């Protein structure tokens, strides 16, 4: 379990450098310190510096730090100017780009329009009910956006970090009905197939569960009492999967059979999987 803790919470009487615009943090994984960082904020632009102690998954660590900074401080831009080549390469995977000698990432403007809590600590959209400010076709994402949200989350899981508009508009603009009936599962599959090695199956609940067990992640289209819904899933261990944006704000961890039994009313579904 990752934890990001302010420096003065661990050492309340120890101040590294007193500045009102600079904040120091430690990153712990299962209680062990793996990194520290500080952020200097000037008018919603944050300058980041990171020191590594024992980080095995550097991309995951930097993603957690970045998501924390955007969620906590609502920064419009984050910059990185240190010379650590390993960190710089991983930040590029997080959509940081070079501007002179620094790397920077400008925060997606639609993300800043959404309420706090819309994105979780890993950068997944977990509160579709907060996305009414994001258009989707002739509608808004709160009512019709579960398909593109599932696609956005799956791409983010696989280190493809696109802007919200790039994902939502690419799906809504290719829909003949302007998203009046939500997202077409076939258009969703077509778009994802261009970026990821996904496969497709529409079948019975039993076959869907069997296929899910042989995949690491994907998108499930299922049917509940209010209609159809897309959710992204990923494998946690041999028998448990995490379902993102199935129940808003909650990270459900269930077996495929448990999920289908509890949340579906029809014994059929569609899966886009890897």
Give residue ranges: language-model regions:
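Short amphipathic alpha-helix that is part of the acyltransferase structural core
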Residues: 1-19
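Short hydrophobic alpha-helix segments
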Residues: 8, 37-38
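Conserved beta-hairpin
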Residues: 23-36
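Conserved GNAT-family N-acetyltransferase fold
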Residues: 35-37, 48, 231
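Acyl-donor binding region in acyl/amide transferases
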Residues: 44-99
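Conserved catalytic-core motifs of GNAT/GCN5-like acyltransferases
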Residues: 97-109
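Active-site-adjacent structural segments surrounding the nucleophilic cysteine of cysteine proteases
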Residues: 108-177
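Conserved active-site-adjacent core of cysteine acyl-enzyme catalytic domains
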Residues: 110-111, 162, 166-273
């Amino acid at each position: 379990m990752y934890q990001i803790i302010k420096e003065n919470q661990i050492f309340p009487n120890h101040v590294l450098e007193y500045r009102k615009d600079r904040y120091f943090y430690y990153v712990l994984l299962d209680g062990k310190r793996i990194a520290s960082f500080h952020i200097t904020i000037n008018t919603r632009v944050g300058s980041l510096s990171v020191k590594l102690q024992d980080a095995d998954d550097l991309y995951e660590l930097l993603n957690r730090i970045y998501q924390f900074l955007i969620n906590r401080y609502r920064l419009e831009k984050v910059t990185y100017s240190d010379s650590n080549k390993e960190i710089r390469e991983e930040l590029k995977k997080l959509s940081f780009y070079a501007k002179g000698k620094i790397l920077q990432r400008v925060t997606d403007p639609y993300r800043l329009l959404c309420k706090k809590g819309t994105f979780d600590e890993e950068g997944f959209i977990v509160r579709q009910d907060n996305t009414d400010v994001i258009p989707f076709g002739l509608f808004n994402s709160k009512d019709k956006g579960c398909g593109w949200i599932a696609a956005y989350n799956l791409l983010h899981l696989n280190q493809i970090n696109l802007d919200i508009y790039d994902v939502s508009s690419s799906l809504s603009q290719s829909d003949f009905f302007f998203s009046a009936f939500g997202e077409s599962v076939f258009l969703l599959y077509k778009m994802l197939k261009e970026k990821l090695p996904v496969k497709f199956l529409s079948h019975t609940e039993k076959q869907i569960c069997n296929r899910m067990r042989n995949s690491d992640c994907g998108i499930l289209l299922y049917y509940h009492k209010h209609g159809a819904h897309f959710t992204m899933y990923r494998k946690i261990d041999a028998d448990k999967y995490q379902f993102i944006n199935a129940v808003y704000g909650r990270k459900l961890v269930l077996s495929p059979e448990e999920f289908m039994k509890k949340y579906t009313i029809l014994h059929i579904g569609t899966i886009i999987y890897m």
